[in-house]
């Protein structure tokens, strides 16, 4: 990111950088000895101590730039993975709307039992959103917001399955 920023800035293009997908800047939460956390419980405690609901504001009012003038249909794009890698592309439909639908479906139908079902491969007990998070299609910020809405805005109480899922998104 820094290399791209420097290149574009050198060409005289103004760039504004902001963290839209995370709650805290990397390295912000540190131990009392000013080290990165290596254990979840103290990390989560510090995370909650510093948390403010305003961190979850998702501003949808940014000006929309003119779209590029070409047709694109990613949904029908052949990545060539199915034949060579045996990947069922229907498992992860393309796009942010599909990712958000998956999060909401998980929270509505599976999250209550998540803490007991998440480690059993025989059960379909997980959210299956890792690819969406890894690719930046949906943010951990958005997932936490949706989880909190479903859990009456409770981080540490409420439905144990939802709090466990939020814990794992926080640690991610």
What are the residue ranges of the model-derived segments?
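Glycine/tryptophan-enriched, flexible segments
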Residues: 42-172
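Trp/Phe/Arg-rich N-terminal binding region typifying the photolyase-homology
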Residues: 1-55
């Amino acid at each position: 990111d820094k290399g791209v920023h420097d290149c574009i800035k050198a060409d005289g293009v103004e760039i504004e950088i902001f963290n839209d997908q995370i709650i805290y800047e990397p390295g912000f939460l540190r131990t009392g000895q000013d080290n990165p956390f290596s254990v979840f419980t103290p990390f989560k405690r510090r995370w909650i101590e510093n948390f403010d609901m305003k961190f979850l504001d998702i501003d949808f009012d940014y000006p929309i730039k003119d779209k590029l003038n070409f047709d694109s249909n990613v949904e029908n794009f052949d990545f060539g993975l199915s034949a060579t890698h045996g990947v069922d592309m229907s498992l992860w439909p393309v796009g942010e709307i599909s990712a958000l639908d998956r999060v909401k479906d998980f929270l509505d139908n599976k999250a209550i039992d998540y803490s007991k079902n998440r480690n059993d491969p025989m059960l379909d007990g997980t959210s299956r959103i890792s690819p969406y998070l890894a690719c930046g299609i949906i943010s951990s910020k958005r997932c936490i917001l949706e989880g909190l809405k479903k859990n009456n805005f409770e981080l540490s109480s409420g439905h144990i399955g939802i709090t466990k899922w939020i814990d794992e998104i926080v640690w991610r």
